[in-house]
Amino acid sequence: MDESATSVLYEIRVRGLLGETLLSAFPGLRARALGTETVLTGPLRDQAALFGVLGLIEALGLELLEVRRTRP
């Protein structure tokens, strides 16, 4: 089965503008600056993958502002 068919698109917002080194920790996610925040967007295959990204955000000391599921 195509992974994109089973993945859910998420938008994850963190405080601060992430440099290339930090962004490289999130392969498969696109990043865009929005004011003084960074928005990471991309498909995650399941909640375990989402929790993995959230755990990495915590481990890197980033401040999580918002998580949104943007596609069913």
Segments from the language model and where they lie:
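Amphipathic, hydrophobic secondary-structure cores in small proteins
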Residues: 9-72
